Amino acid sequence: MTFQLSPELAAVVDSGLLSPVRAGTPVEAAVSDAAWLAAMVEAETALVRAQARLGTVPESAAAAIVEAARPERLDLVALARASRETANPVVGFVKALTAVVAAEDPAAAEYVHRGSTSQDILDTATMLVVRRAGVLIRADLDRCAAALERLARTHRATPMAGRTLTLHAVPTTFGLKAAGWLHLVTEARRRTAALAAALPVELGGAAGTLAGYLEHANNPGDDYADRLVEAYAHETGLAPATLPWHVLRTPIADTGAVCAFLAAALGKIAVDVQSLARTEVGEVTEPAVAGRGASSAMPHKRNPVLATLIRSAALQVPQHAAVLYGAMLAEDERSGGAWHAEWQPLRECLRLAGGAAHTAVELLTGLTVDADRMRANLDLTGGQIVSERVAAVLTPLLGKAQARALLTRASHEAADRGTSLAEVLSAAPEVTRHLTAAELEELLDPTRYLGAAPGLVDRAVGGPDRAVPHRSAA
């Protein structure tokens, strides 16, 4: 049986059905087609304001263009379809914008896109979109960091099994694990802020020489190009570019790299949560929300869906970022294909990373930590989790090789017999000759073998009693 979509549903190109990590999140709207169109309008109006500031476009014309240029006056779907004829959306956009301005002021319409080129407008618009998405992302990262600091402080000395290559290794604390997550989130936050501060305008004209701008300005002076770039940067709030970057794609590659790191940082948290939430581990659980995590087949399940969503994004973003790095191989002064290949992967980087950050806020602010289960799991190996400690104490007494061999044999025997390491060691003359029962019991207490974990937590969060300042989302 064939199902027919209604015209309304058919018109919805991408609602996030297959990308739930970002569906309905704030960043989704910030990087939508409508947001890009609004940024293109802003790029064009900022350009004409900059030209008017330098006296090369009449103030009245600039004012008329700014007044008439409204995204809602443009047909987004028509522009998208028209872009198939020109391989970029700006050509049709400029034509439509000129018509809108001409309907209000025909003389002013002559100054729309004056001396410019498609890539100047779309690249600048892209930087505006990246900046706005970044504000949302940094706000979410700040909330993640605050939640992680609370977890690290609360569980500074909460003992749990440290696991290496999936197996119990030595004891650690959940606070140290949370502090490690905090370190990654803080670094991601720093990188997004540094990226935002460096986002540049694009102004190069047809082939990177700004010749069209200069010609239309009618020989205004040798420093006009520099002054125009500065004025354009002022009008947009972006950074002035040292050179046109039509084929020098550092800002785009940097955006992809920051998104990839951010997604990976959150992905590390997600995979840890998934591992700790396993039925047989049960040390953490995601926030309990009615209906969330339900299985279509198994009524008993409450799946860790938030961690799953974040992990899905973390697995995708690096691949999209790789496309952006590949697009740096842009030939000549303007590329046919490399530039065009960036647009959708860049959007995916932003909305997946932004969706992951927004999802991580809910995960981390509502994460439940089961300290009792953590303590119980420390005893699963019957004391073997502190075999390193016992070997270290016996080494000066027996020698390194003999102490290690003894603990290896004892651990295997305890596992084979299904008994504790303490029982095996208490029957070993090499041990009882040097250690009393009380001393052995103390050595095998996993809560007394946390190393520097609590102090490392203090270092990460600025001390046991000092709050860590979190930067604003600006």
Swiss-Prot record:
<dbReference type="InterPro" id="IPR008948">
    <property type="entry name" value="L-Aspartase-like"/>
</dbReference>
<dbReference type="InterPro" id="IPR022761">
    <property type="entry name" value="Fumarate_lyase_N"/>
</dbReference>
<feature type="binding site">
    <location>
        <position position="301"/>
    </location>
    <ligand>
        <name>fumarate</name>
    </ligand>
</feature>
<feature type="active site" description="Proton acceptor">
    <location>
        <position position="295"/>
    </location>
</feature>
<feature type="active site" description="Proton donor">
    <location>
        <position position="334"/>
    </location>
</feature>
<comment type="similarity">
    <text>Belongs to the class-II fumarase/aspartase family.</text>
</comment>
<dbReference type="Pfam" id="PF00206">
    <property type="entry name" value="Lyase_1"/>
</dbReference>
<dbReference type="InterPro" id="IPR019468">
    <property type="entry name" value="AdenyloSucc_lyase_C"/>
</dbReference>
<dbReference type="GO" id="GO:0016829">
    <property type="term" value="F:lyase activity"/>
</dbReference>
<protein>
    <recommendedName>
        <fullName>Nitrosuccinate lyase</fullName>
        <ecNumber>4.3.99.5</ecNumber>
    </recommendedName>
</protein>
<comment type="function">
    <text>Involved in the biosynthesis of desferrioxamine derivatives which have iron-binding properties and may act as siderophores. Catalyzes the formation of nitrous acid from nitrosuccinic acid (2-nitrobutanedioate) by elimination of its nitro group.</text>
</comment>
<dbReference type="InterPro" id="IPR000362">
    <property type="entry name" value="Fumarate_lyase_fam"/>
</dbReference>
<dbReference type="InterPro" id="IPR024083">
    <property type="entry name" value="Fumarase/histidase_N"/>
</dbReference>
<keyword id="KW-0456">Lyase</keyword>
<dbReference type="Pfam" id="PF10397">
    <property type="entry name" value="ADSL_C"/>
</dbReference>
<feature type="binding site">
    <location>
        <position position="303"/>
    </location>
    <ligand>
        <name>fumarate</name>
    </ligand>
</feature>
